[in-house]
A protein has these predicted regions:
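Charge-rich, intrinsically disordered N-terminal extensions
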Residues: 1-180, 439
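Catalytic-site neighborhood detector that most strongly recognizes the C-terminal catalytic loop/helix
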Residues: 421-446
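Conserved tyrosine-mediated DNA breakage-rejoining catalytic core shared by Y-recombinases
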Residues: 215, 250-335
């Protein structure tokens, strides 16, 4: 009986000592080596992206497996697969699914993302030497997973059949692309009415009433009662506008005194290419590997504790870093005061047998993680009477929305906001600065009152 399972593997494509850990798919015929090679060519992609690619190809293999001898033409199988992603495989009238897949209906955006991942992989397959050899047998008679996947790649290459996942006809016209036979559904354009920014009037409460250390009480001194680490990180998010993953990449040496405004100067470097704090090392990846036997945190697997993402922000220097721009500027001084208290009273130094350069640590002295900070933030939000919810802006990402909207309220231009938020595209900041319908109505009322 056939099966498809995912496992972590160590991949090496030459005789050097270089090796990487990748997620891989195994079938009854063995490892799907072509997809493993595909992932190995995508080292610049995040671990999250690689996991989604594996998941997408596994879905296709699962679908091929349960539909053995069902389709004469590969294009018909691919069309049916695309349809099943969108509508599911369950007959809800009979509460039955003969295929055993039991796929529920997927959101259009999610289904199209799956198709996009498969298309990238089949494009890769179609470019490989020898892929013609794996199509010696008709698709219906093909036995190996690799052969079936190469048939999918063949149809993709010959007739652009697999998918067109653009979200609008206007975008398609601009791109002037060839429309493929099998297309993802068009996703309706929706402007999110609920602006997901953290409530401005609740931020101080979050810091000084929400972030309370375990087993503390009101009678204790603030150095024992307040959680300075979580306060400092939240200030970086809300007043510095950084993404929640970016604090994980900050070294202790990256936080210094600003030479002009007496606040903190915080630089966030690229996890791999950023300049090393020790000039004898070429970059941060070499520095981490050589001095600490660690990897850049982007290169750990998603399931590993040290993993942290990186959204490719706009870097401003050949040393591959950007500077945190505090808003208001005085927040840089407030952050520095909190950070100094964290270092003096609460930071647990790294273990002697497991040293590291990271600024924020947990109770064991290990590098702090996004997951642990999310837990602390959730409890702090609940402690001040709010409900942790992305739609209410009360998750960690709501702080970045607050930062962008605050800059817009201060009158900064779109280009200035782009630079402050370190976006490569000037339009990326628009989602952070859009007003709600209620705010537009209130502005209309104020203008009309002057008539």
């Amino acid at each position: 009986m056939g099966y498809i399972i995912k496992r972590k593997v160590i991949y090496r494509n030459d005789r050097t000592g270089k090796k990487i850990k990748l997620p891989a798919l195994f079938t009854e015929s063995g490892i799907v080596i072509s997809h493993l090679r595909f992932l190995a060519t995508k080292q610049g992609r995040s671990q999250s992206w690689k996991e989604k690619s594996v998941f997408s190809v596994k879905l296709l293999l699962d679908y091929i497996h349960v539909n053995e001898n069902t389709f004469e033409r590969t294009v018909d199988l691919l069309q049916s697969f695309s349809d099943c992603l969108n509508v599911g495989t369950i007959d809800y009238n009979q509460m039955h699914d003969p295929s055993g897949l039991f796929w529920k209906r997927r959101d259009v955006k999610y289904a199209n993302n799956i198709l996009a991942h498969i298309t990238l992989y089949t494009d890769f397959l179609a470019r490989q030497k020898g892929y013609e050899d794996n199509r010696e047998n008709p698709f219906r008679n093909a036995t190996l997973a690799e052969q079936k996947l190469n048939w999918c790649a063949y149809y993709q290459r010959q007739a652009n059949v697999f998918l067109n996942h653009l979200s609008s006809t206007t975008e398609a016209e601009k791109q002037c692309i060839k429309i493929r036979t099998i297309t993802g559904q068009l996703q309706p354009k929706v402007e999110n009415e609920k602006v997901k920014r953290f409530p401005e009037d609740k931020f101080v409460d979050l810091l000084y009433r929400g972030f309370i250390r375990p087993y503390s009480n009101i009678s204790m001194h603030e150095n024992e009662r307040l959680d300075y680490k979580s306060i400092a990180i939240s200030m970086l998010l809300n007043k510095g506008g950084i993404r929640k993953s970016e604090f994980c990449h900050i070294y202790s040496s990256d936080i210094t005194l600003h030479p002009v405004n007496d606040g903190a100067l915080v630089r966030i470097y690229h996890p791999s290419f950023g300049s090393s704090p020790d000039p004898q090392y070429k970059n941060r990846e070499t520095y981490l590997k050589t001095k600490y036997n660690l990897l850049p945190r982007t290169k750990y697997q998603l399931s590993e504790r040290l993993y942290a993402g990186w959204k490719e922000p706009l870097l401003i220097d050949s040393q591959y870093y950007f500077e945190v721009i505090f808003s208001p500027v005085s927040a840089g001084k407030d952050f520095l005061e909190v950070y100094k208290k964290y270092l003096k009273y609460q930071r647990v130094p790294p273990p002697k047998l497991a040293p590291h350069p990271f600024a924020f640590t947990n109770q064991k002295g290990e590098p702090e993680t996004i997951k642990n900070f999310q837990r602390l933030h959730k409890r702090a939000v609940e402690r001040i009477g709010l409900i942790p919810s992305k739609n209410e802006g009360t998750t960690e990402h709501g702080h970045r929305h607050s930062y962008g909207y605050r800059l817009a309220q201060f009158g900064f231009s779109q280009v200035e906001i782009q630079k402050a938020m370190h976006h490569k595209n000037s339009n990326s900041c628009l989602v952070y600065i859009q007003p709600t319908s209620d705010e537009i109505v209130e502005k209309m009322k104020a203008i009309e009152a002057l008539w």
